[in-house]
Curated annotation (Swiss-Prot):
It holds the Pfam family ThiC_Rad_SAM. One of its GO terms (biological process) is thiamine diphosphate biosynthetic process. Keywords: 4Fe-4S, Iron, Iron-sulfur, Lyase, Metal-binding, S-adenosyl-L-methionine, Thiamine biosynthesis, Zinc. GO terms for molecular function: 4 iron, 4 sulfur cluster binding; carbon-carbon lyase activity; zinc ion binding. Zn(2+) binds at residues 429, 493. It comes from Acinetobacter baumannii (strain SDF). Homodimer. Its EC number is 4.1.99.17. Substrate binds at residues 231, 260, 289, 325, 345-347, 386-389, 425, 452. The gene is thiC. Belongs to the ThiC family. Signal peptide: none annotated. This is Phosphomethylpyrimidine synthase.
């Protein structure tokens, strides 16, 4: 891939080679498997983790493989040749064509998209295989919500049902705590009909633009597995197209369910094209960021026409959901005046500045119905932005935040009237005891539309560790009902994250999401925990590593003190050593108890024999000698 960078050609080539190895290396003891649906082209990917047998001394039983949800796409399929210059193979193209409700356009229709194609300065960095976009035929609505309301189960819905189940019905150890789901539904099996019903009622969304056929369908809703989003994107201070594509593929490898491209630097249009064409997961954006770049960063120069063209430009590229800050109303802006940190949302501050400069209502609000018409022509989902979210715990749950949330509830109904899919963005910075109020109010005013939250961060004193401060809040709000958690990296508030930061943020949020699934009692959520705990008790070290969210780190930490291969079968670790391992002691206690059981039976027989002698001797305790 040719592109703008300060590295030499040799350095770029070496970096590409290393990235390719990192991205395509399958995790240890794992293999990509596909579950076929009702038709041959529904092939749902999962990762199967093989386990070793229990040692003979501990019972010698066979441990079946564990199936886990997989977001890595074909990058971890050894049978697929990866070529970033061509993009990923299409998953949904045939399904889209079969519905016969879209037209292939003769070319891009957005003014800016056409300009970029003609600009010779972008030729070297442009994706080489740009396809003509699709759009709904006149009078047609192509959203998954529209199909669901018509009673149609699409291939995407069947795909999702298979994916959500993770074949947990085959798991051997399904013991699980019941959990507290706060009114969510815990079905033992997700069916295509249930997926359809949840989408029709607005309780879940399937972000799947008709111009992103490469994506593997997924669902966001509180009655499904809690999902996580990873943010990437360049800035005016750095990063390149190569780096952003690498971050995207790296993020999906470790479990990102969706990606948001928040680029604000150079070549936003081209960067986004590369990302979408190579992404197996839905891509979200904040269109106002690019619109602002088109007016050289001067918020008051923004117009509806510029924003509308930006929406069409991004929809034709294949963006699956838009964050749109239509709830930042003119009358709400003064409510932020006494805040400790004011308006911290970039999108929110842009629209607040525009409203004050013109003393007019937010044009995203006044043109909302027109935005809906664009969204339904491409099946782009709304992610209604929380532009007035609290930027510190002092500002949590204030009048500005909740006023905007109520407006987002109103906008949700307006979108649903046009069968446009909606999720709602949430805070932010909220101390633990104030988190549930956010979830309860959102469920009430937005009628159970999926909630998508950034954390929330539960304290403000830990720069450099905000992936942890936010994961605490994320686990809690995920338990209460949030459908998707936006990850936070260690670099939050400090700088642009690199690959390591992205991975750290994702693993942290995978923990939070899984903890929420366990707390809700989501069926099958505990199967992997049970398998890992069993491996730990049986000192199957490799199985412990392989079942973990980050096998590489688990193995590396173990090997820092016990690096030899023989240590992988040792019945202790460096924490306690061979004499004080609690699990080894427990096994000894079990062995002792088993031996006691045998001894007890022998004693029992002896007592029985003495009883017979006693009866034969007339049941007398004493006898004359």
């Amino acid at each position: 891939m040719n592109q703008l960078t300060n590295l030499s050609s040799a350095e770029i080539s070496a970096q590409h080679e290393q990235d390719a190895k990192d991205l395509t290396r399958i995790l240890p003891a794992s293999k990509k498997v596909y579950i076929e649906g009702s038709r041959p082209d529904i092939q749902v990917p999962m990762r199967e983790i093989s386990l070793t047998d229990t040692p003979t001394g501990l019972g010698g039983e066979h441990n079946p493989p564990i199936m886990v949800y997989d977001t890595s796409g074909v990058y971890t399929d050894p049978n697929v040749q990866i070529d970033l210059n061509k993009g990923l193979p299409s998953v949904r193209q045939k399904w889209i064509e079969e519905r016969n409700d879209t037209d292939v356009l003769s070319g891009l229709t957005s003014k800016f998209g056409q300009e970029r194609l003609k600009d010779i300065r972008t030729a070297d960095i442009r994706f080489a295989h740009i396809q003509n976009p699709r759009r709904a035929k006149a009078g047609k609505n192509v959203t998954q919500m529209h199909y669901a309301k018509q009673g149609i189960i699409t291939p995407e819905m069947e795909y999702i049902a298979i994916r959500e189940n993770q074949r947990q019905h085959e798991a051997v150890d399904m013991r699980q705590h019941p959990g507290q789901n706060f009114g969510a539904k815990n079905l033992k099996e997700i069916t295509p009909e249930f997926v359809r019903q949840e989408v029709a009622e607005g309780r879940a969304i399937i972000p799947a633009n008709i111009n992103h056929p490469e994506l593997e369908p997924m669902i966001i809703g509180r009655n499904f597995l809690v999902k996580i989003n990873a943010n990437i994107g360049n800035s005016a201070l750095g990063s390149s197209i190569d780096e952003e594509v690498a971050k995207m593929t790296w993020a999906t490898r470790w479990g990102a369910d969706t990606i948001m491209d928040l680029s604000t630097g150079k070549n936003i249009h081209e960067t986004r094209e590369w990302i979408i064409r190579n992404s197996p997961v839905p891509i979200g954006t904040v269109p106002i960021y690019q619109a602002l770049e088109k007016v050289d960063g001067v918020a008051e120069n923004l117009t509806w026409e510029i924003f509308k063209d930006t929406l069409i430009e991004q929809a034709e590229q294949g963006v699956d959901y838009f964050t749109i800050h239509a709830g930042v109303l003119l009358r709400y802006v003064p409510l932020t005046a006494n805040r400790l940190t004011g308006i911290v949302s970039r999108g929110g501050s842009i629209m607040a500045q525009w409203c004050l400069a013109h003393h007019e209502e937010n044009f995203l609000y006044t043109h909302f119905d027109e935005i809906c018409e664009i969204m339904k022509a491409y099946d782009v989902s709304f992610s209604l932005g929380d532009g007035l979210r609290p930027g510190c715990i002092q500002d949590a749950n204030d009048e500005a935040q909740f006023s905007e949330l109520k407006t987002l509830g109103e906008l949700t109904h307006r979108a649903w009237e046009r069968d446009v899919q909606v999720m709602i963005e949430g805070p932010g910075h909220v101390p633990m005891h104030m988190i549930k109020e956010n979830m309860d109010l959102q469920l009430e005013v937005c009628k159970e539309a999926p909630f998508y939250t950034l954390g929330p961060l539960t304290t403000d004193i830990a720069p450099g560790y905000d992936h942890i401060t936010s994961a605490i809040g994320a686990a809690m709000i995920g338990w209460y009902g949030t459908a998707m958690l936006c990850y936070v990296t260690p670099k939050e508030h400090l700088g642009l994250p690199n690959k390591k930061d992205v991975k750290d943020g994702i693993i942290t949020y995978k923990i939070a999401a899984h903890a929420a699934d366990l707390a809700k009692g989501h069926p099958g959520a505990q199967a992997r925990d049970n398998a890992l705990s069993k491996a730990r008790f049986e000192f199957r070290w490799d199985d412990q590593f392989n079942l973990s969210l980050d096998p590489d780190t688990a193995r590396s930490m173990h090997d820092e003190t016990l690096p030899k291969e023989a240590h992988k079968s040792a019945h202790f670790c460096s924490m306690c050593g061979p004499k004080f391992c609690s699990m080894k002691i427990t096994q000894n206690v079990r062995d002792y108890a088993n031996n006691l059981t045998n001894s007890d039976s022998e004693v029992e027989e002896g007592l029985k024999a003495m009883k017979e002698v006693y009866q034969e001797q007339g049941q007398k305790l004493y006898h004359k000698v």
